[in-house]
Design a protein with these regions (language model features):
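Charged structural interfaces that engage phosphate-rich ligands
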Residues: 1-153
C-alpha cells in the first residue's frame, strides 16, 4: 500500500488552482513557526480550514463545508465587486492588491469523528483554533474580524 502524502495539491482543472500554494507545510510570516498541513487537500476538498494570504503578509483563516474552490471563488467575487462586508475584499481593494495577488492553501481537513458527533461544530472549533494559533485577528495581525468561541460551549 502506497503512502499518500499530506499537503496541498492543485487539481489543475479549475481556475482557482492558479492561486493555490502547493505545500506540505507552511511558515507563519511573523513568528517563523512551521506547521504541517493536516490531510491531503485540493481545491475539491470539503470540510476544511484554509488560509488566504496577501502581499502584506496578512492572513485570513476560514472554513468551508463545500468544495474549497467554491469558497475561494466567493472571496474573489467579493474582491471584484468591492463587497464592504468582506474583510478580505476591503483589504485587497484598499491596498490595491489584484486578484492575482491572492494565495490560498488548506490547513486541515476535518474528518467525521470516529465515534460520531457534530462535524460542523468540530469544523468551527478547528477554525477558531487556527485563528487563535496563527494570530490572524484584525486590525494588526490579520484579516479575521471576529472569532466566536461559543462553539466550545
Amino acid at each position: 500500500m502506497s503512502h499518500i502524502p499530506n499537503g496541498n495539491f492543485p487539481c489543475h482543472n479549475c481556475i482557482q488552482c492558479q492561486n493555490m500554494v502547493k505545500c506540505t507545510s507552511f511558515t507563519h510570516p511573523r513568528t517563523g513557526k512551521e506547521y504541517k498541513v493536516k490531510g491531503r487537500i485540493s481545491c475539491r476538498s470539503t470540510y476544511c480550514v484554509y488560509a488566504l494570504t496577501c502581499p502584506c503578509k496578512l492572513w485570513y483563516i476560514g472554513k468551508t463545508k463545500r468544495e474549497l474552490k467554491t469558497r475561494i471563488c466567493e472571496h474573489k467575487w467579493a474582491i471584484r465587486h468591492h463587497d464592504e462586508k468582506s474583510s478580505v475584499a476591503r483589504h485587497f481593494n484598499q491596498a490595491n492588491h489584484s486578484l492575482g495577488d491572492l494565495r490560498f492553501f488548506g490547513i486541515e481537513i476535518v474528518n467525521m469523528p470516529k465515534r460520531g458527533g457534530d462535524r460542523d461544530r468540530l469544523l468551527l472549533q478547528r477554525e477558531c483554533f487556527w485563528i487563535h494559533s496563527l494570530d490572524s485577528m484584525m486590525p494588526n495581525s490579520g484579516l479575521n474580524e471576529e472569532n466566536i468561541f461559543t462553539c466550545f460551549l
